[in-house]
Amino acid sequence: MFNKIIKLGQKKFNKSDQHHQDNNNNNNNTSTNTVVRGSRTTTPAPSSVSNGESQTTAQSPSQTPNHPMFTTTPILEVLPLLKDVSSSDRPLLFMKKAHMCSCHCDFSDTLIMPREKEIKRQTLLELVDFLHSSSGKVNETMQSELIRMVSANIFRCLPPAYHENTGAPPEGNDPEEEEPYLEPWWPHLQLVYELLLRYVVSSEIEPKTAKKFINHTFVSRLLDLFDSEDPREREYLKTVLHRIYGKFIFHRPFIRCSIYNIFYKFLYETERCIGIGELLEILGSVINGFTVPMREEHRLYLVKAILPLHKSKGISIYHQQLAYCVTQFVEKDYKLADTVIRGLLKFWPLTNCQKEVLFLGELEEVLDATEPSEFQQCVVPLFTQIGKCLNSAHFQVAERALFLWNNEHIVGLIAQNKDVIFPIIFEALERNMKGHWNQAVHGLSENVRRMFLEMDTELFEECEKQYLENEAKACELLEQRELTWKRLEEAASLAAN
C-alpha cells in the first residue's frame, strides 16, 4: 500500500517538477532565494527562500538523500499519518514529511495558500508528536533530513531594525523603544523550533550521532539568530542552546567562546542590545556550574567580556541578567569580589542617574557575597564613590546609596572597617543634613549618622571635630579669596581713574 502511494507521489512530483522548471527558466533573472529588503549579519541557509515569497515550493537543501523522492522540489500535499503505516515504511515517510516541510509559505496575506499552510502546520505537529512519543525511533538518515529541514526554515536573513536603514530615523526616536518586529510566519517557525527542541532533549538521540548534525557550524548559525527582534524566537533559541550546552559536552568550550565573541562584537562594533539578555541568562546557568577553584580562562572572560557590558547605554535592557552573572562569579569564588567591585567603579556612570541606581543595586548584591578580606582591598575607592552618591542631587541615587545601610552584612563589613569609612562619608552625611532638598534623603542621612554614633562614639566625635575644622578652614579660605578679589577690583578702579 505504501509503495503505491510513493509511486503516485513520484508521478505528481515529476509533473510538478517539469512545470516549476519551466517557470524557473522564464524567471531566472528575477528570482532569488534570499531576503531582499536589507539583511543583517545572520547567514542565510543556502536553500531557504524569502519570508515574503508567494510560491508554494522552495528549493530543497543541498546534500539531499539519494532517493527518488528527494530529487524533486518539495510540494506540500497530504500524506498518510506516521502511525498508520508499518514500522518498516515509517522512516521513509518521516523523511518525506521532513523534506516537504522545507517549503516556505507566504504569510504576507492570510488569503494566500491557506491549504498549504495548514498542511505544513499539521505535518510539523505530527513530527513533534512523533519525536515526543516513545515510538519515535529516529535513525541517522532520518536525523540528517530532520536537521536539514530545520536549517532550511530557521536560518535566514533577518530584516534590519528601523534605525539601521539608510534613511535617518525621526528626531527623538529611540531604537530601544521601538516595537519589536514579529515574524509573520511564526505559526510554522514555532513548530520548527519545538521540533528542534524535542530532538535535542530526546533520550533516544545519542550525542555521538547527533554531533554530526549539531556541529559547530550549526551552533554558530544558531547564535547568529539571537539578533532576531522577535522575543518569542529568542526565548526558544535560549532554551534550545541551553539544552545543547547541557547535552553536548564537547561543544561547551565553543559555545562559551562564541557567546563572549558576541559580547565583544556588541561592545566594540554594533552596540546592538538584542539578544544580549538571553545570552547572559544562559551564561548565568553556565557560571553556576563552574568548578572551584575557577580556571584562569573564566576569570579573563569576566574582566574582558562581562564587566565591560556595564558601559553600554542600553544596559537597562539586560542589567538584571548581567547582575546575576556578576554575582554568580563572586559567589563561586569570593576572591573575585575585589576585581568585580573595581570593575563596577571603572564603568560607573557620571551623568546617567537611572543607570547609577542600577549600579548601586548591583553593588549591594555583590557586597552581600563579599568576604571581609576582599572588602578591605577596595574599601577606600568604593566608599569614595558611595560618598559622591550620598550627595547626589538626584534623590533616587542618594536614597539608593543610603539603603545600603539596611543590609546587615554590609553594615557588618562597615563596622569592621569603620576607622577608614567614617572619615570618608562623614562630610557627605553632614551636607545632606544641612542642605539636601529632599526630606526623605535628609531623614535617611540622619539615621545613618545616628548609627555611626552608636557604633563608635569616640570615632564619631573625632570625625565631627575634623569636619568642623575643615569647615572653618574652608570659610577662612573663602573670606581670603573674596578679600583678594575686592582688592583687585579696587586696584582696577584706581587704575581706570
Curated annotation (Swiss-Prot):
Location within or outside the cell: Cytoplasm
One example of a Gene Ontology biological process annotation: signal transduction
Presence of the UniProt keyword Cytoplasm in the record: yes
Biased composition (Low complexity): 23-34
Recorded family membership: Belongs to the phosphatase 2A regulatory subunit B56 family.
GO cellular component, one term: protein phosphatase type 2A complex
Alphabetically ordered keywords of this record: Cytoplasm
Biased composition (Polar residues): 35-71
Functional note: The B regulatory subunit may modulate substrate selectivity and catalytic activity, and may also direct the localization of the catalytic enzyme to a particular subcellular compartment.
Designated name of the protein: Serine/threonine protein phosphatase 2A 57 kDa regulatory subunit B' epsilon isoform
GO molecular function: protein phosphatase regulator activity
Superkingdom, natural source: Eukaryota
Pfam families the UniProt entry points to: B56
Family matches, as Gene3D superfamilies: Leucine-rich Repeat Variant (1.25.10.10)
InterPro entries attached to this UniProt entry: ARM-like, ARM-type_fold, PP2A_B56
Subunit annotation: PP2A consists of a common heteromeric enzyme, composed of a catalytic subunit (subunits C), a constant regulatory subunit (subunit A), and a variety of regulatory subunits such as subunits B (the R2/B/PR55/B55, R3/B''/PR72/PR130/PR59 and R5/B'/B56 families).
Keyword match Cytoplasm: yes
Main location: cytoplasm
Tissue specificity note: Expressed ubiquitously.
Segments of this protein annotated with the region Disordered: 12-71
